[in-house]
Structures are given as structure tokens and as C-alpha cells.
Amino acid sequence: MNKTAIALLALLASSASLAATPWQKITQPVPGSAQSIGSFSNGCIVGADTLPIQSEHYQVMRTDQRRYFGHPDLVMFIQRLSSQVSNLGMGTVLIGDMGMPAGGRFNGGHASHQTGLDVDIFLQLPKTRWTSAQLLRPQALDLVSRDGKHVVSTLWKPEIFSLIKLAAQDKDVTRIFVNPAIKQQLCLDAGTDRDWLRKVRPWFQHRAHMHVRLRCPADSLECEDQPLPPSGDGCGAELQSWFAPLKPGTTKPEKKTPPPLPPSCQALLDEHVI
């Protein structure tokens, strides 16, 4: 798919996510065994876990938004990754949005993050823990140059390379979305150990954070996985195509209507939202 078409799809998905959503009305996880249902951009979750706010290895940003819920596998991944980072003396992991208590569509900012299997992680590792004020209004560190063609060399750190690599090497991770310029720098720095690069996918924005996505849990029978990324390290023509100028669109994007919910998610809404 060419980049013009992908950009249009991204815009449409973002527009759909801005529509009013009833999922915010569910303020606690739905009781039951953990089940991720549907697709990453059209689904929900039963039995979500709450990521503990207090941890010596990570800090949770924007807790007032209450987007720190996810499948137990996601909570364990965050704890596993942040422990590895801490043991290597790299700094504190900054956790952004996961999902809402029952997953589902956000009213803005995300098209995915609906099944409790996605998390945003800042691409900075402070040596000194952030204050409560900093966590509530975090300052993102834009690692990408203005022209979008490379990272800012003074901001790019070996620890950020290692953070992304550690996440990609995790057995439960299927994709990590970063800006194309960040993917390009990873390709340059990777050396001969390159298998993990397959999971790192270029995507629009993502200049200051990585978006980590886990595979569907084996016992979540209604969860819809994505196809695996193409074979190879993704550092060749596919990556370079992201730096080609977009062709002007010939039509205005139409407002996209969100697709019907999976039946189990609709039933969940019918039961828990008046």
C-alpha cells in the first residue's frame, strides 16, 4: 500500500476515534477471567488488570486519565521490561497510555489500544524520578529532526536503542511502532544482531514514544491477531519509501463510521452501560 493511502487510512481512523464513546462510562474492570476480544482497533477486554501505579522500576504518566488497564500479559510485560532496564542501570521507564478498564474506543488520541494489549512508552529514561507534576503533564522529547529524515544526534542515546531492542526481543511482543527516522537509526546501530528489527515497524508520528503491541493470549479465543510483519529486518526499500514525498490527495477524506463492535463487546456495553 502506498504512503498516501496509508496516511489517508490513519487520518480516517483518527477521526473515527474522536467520536463520542460510551466506554469511558465503565470505570472499573469487568469481572471475569481475562479475555481480549476483537481486534486492536475494534474490541474490548474482560478481566483487565490494573497496572500498579507505584513501582521502583517505572512511573505511570497522566494517571488522571485512568488509562492504565490491560490484559495481565501486558501488565507482566511492563513489569518485566522495566525490571530489565533497571537492572542494567539505564533509568526509569515512563509508561503512557495502556487502555481503559474495559478497553474499547477512546474519544481521541488512539484508534487502537482497545483490547488491553497495547502500551505507549516514552523514549527517554530519566535517571532521576519525575515529580507528580511532571507525570501529570509530561514533556515529550522529540527525537526526530524537523524534516523527519533522521534523529537528532544530540538527543539519541544508546539507552534508547537498548530499550527498544529489549522490548522487541520479548516473547510476547509482535510489533513496536516508531517514527521512520527512529527505525532508520535502529537499522544503522543494530550491527549483525538484526532479527528483532522485524518487529519494529515505521509509522506516522511516534517521534517521542514507542507503541508496543502484544500477541493475542492463547486463551483469548475471540482475539484477532494481526498477520506477522514481513520477513527480514525491514531496513531496505520498505523503510526508504517512508521518506518519499507524499503525493497530493485527489479527494477529501470522508468521515469514517466506526465498524460494528464484536458481539461480545456489544453485549458487554449493553450490560454495563445504561
UniProtKB/Swiss-Prot annotation:
Question: At which positions is Zn(2+) 2 bound?
Answer: D147, H150
Keyword match Plastid: no
All disulfide bonds of the chain are: C44-C265, C187-C235, C216-C223
Pfam families in the record:
Peptidase_M74
Q: How is the cofactor bound here? A: Binds 2 Zn(2+) ions per subunit. Zn(2+) ion 1 is bound in the active site. Zn(2+) ion 2 is bound at the dimer interface by residues from both subunits.
List the signal peptide residues: 1-19
Q: Which GO terms describe its molecular function?
A: metal ion binding; metalloendopeptidase activity; serine-type endopeptidase activity
One cellular component term (GO) for this entry is: outer membrane-bounded periplasmic space
Cite the InterPro entries for this sequence: Hedgehog_sig/DD-Pept_Zn-bd_sf, Peptidase_M74
Q: Identify the EC number(s).
A: 3.4.24.-
- Main location, first listed in the record: periplasm
Q: Which UniProt keywords apply?
A: Disulfide bond, Hydrolase, Metal-binding, Metalloprotease, Periplasm, Protease, Signal, Zinc
Which GO terms fall under biological process for this protein? peptidoglycan metabolic process; proteolysis
What residues bind Zn(2+) 1, as annotated? Answer: H110, H113, D120, H211
Q: Which domain of life is it from?
A: Bacteria
Q: What class of enzyme is it?
A: hydrolase
The cofactors it requires, by name, are:
Zn(2+)
Q: Where in the cell is it found?
A: Periplasm
Biological role stated in the UniProt entry: Murein endopeptidase that cleaves the D-alanyl-meso-2,6-diamino-pimelyl amide bond that connects peptidoglycan strands. Likely plays a role in the removal of murein from the sacculus.
The UniProt family comment states: Belongs to the peptidase M74 family.
**Quaternary assembly:** Dimer.
According to UniProt, the name of this protein is Penicillin-insensitive murein endopeptidase
